[in-house]
Amino acid sequence: MSAVSLKPLAVLAFAGTTLLAGLQPAAEPVPAPQADAAKPAASEPAAHVSRTARLQAFLTGRYGKDAKLSGQWRGSWTQDDETRAIDWQVCAEQPVVTGDSWQQLLAVCGALVDGAHIDPGTIEFFVLQPKGDGFGVTSELTGERFGSGGQPGTASIIRAGSDFYGFRVEDGWFGQGFSLLSQTLVLPGPKGLTSTGNVRSHIDNDAQYECENVDAAADPDTAEDCRTRRFSIDFALRFDDSDRSARIWPLLIEETGNTCGGKRVRQEHRFTLDPKSWTYSFPESLRREGCE
């Protein structure tokens, strides 16, 4: 089984060797013939451009001169005819092998500078391929909203098939004692990058005010009420890679934890990507906010 929590695949190194051409000196210096002097000089071999240099050039061209591979830079984001200040940063990047070539996956996260609690952040996704001395865009998905408080959550790169890669986003909402975390899969499809579905990654009400400090000395009725209503459940996402040659691997979600009344939960859900809609048919129970 291949879990998305495992460290990303080792970054591929692409290096080139510059070839140097030289002439052996003649035994005696002899003036070159006039015809030879008129010949055009042989073209120099193309200089190797590193992957990081290509990435930096793409970021600068897309986001401006302040964009960088490491750390934040200030920019702007226009959505619904409103332009707001935003702090951008690269939140996931990895080269991947696809067939007999390679691609560069890139996610750029944006956090609103003055985001209110209800405001989401944004993440922009790119699949790039080498083109000349830079990168060309094979597919992109921009303007996607995630998270709260102006923060977009986190992005990671996943392997979902033999040579099929995409992105996983985890974001959440916290309030009134509840934690509601979700995970979204963004995968390349026939029409480019697309959001294929959204499910919970974790839910709990551990910080509910009236139950946060309940202990053995608490009123029995209060303690029982809190125990009845308390829940904490994880939804771990991974891909079934038992057939490693399969183009797209089945998706597994393992639901574990405690539901209301202290009942233990442990069950596995299995899904396949619909080839027509390019989505996973997740049930509402995997998007719930509390006990079933």
Predicted regions mapped to residue ranges:
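Short beta-strand elements that form the blades of beta-propeller/WD-repeat-like
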Residues: 103-113, 163-172, 246-255
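Short, solvent-exposed coil/turn segments at beta-strand boundaries
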Residues: 98-103, 131-132, 158-165, 189-192, ...
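Short N-terminal edge-element motif at the start of the domain
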Residues: 82-160
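Bacterial N-terminal signal peptides that target proteins for export
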Residues: 1-12
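Bacterial N-terminal signal peptides
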Residues: 10-21
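Acidic, small-residue rich beta-repeat scaffolds with periodic aromatic anchors
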Residues: 22-78, 175-292
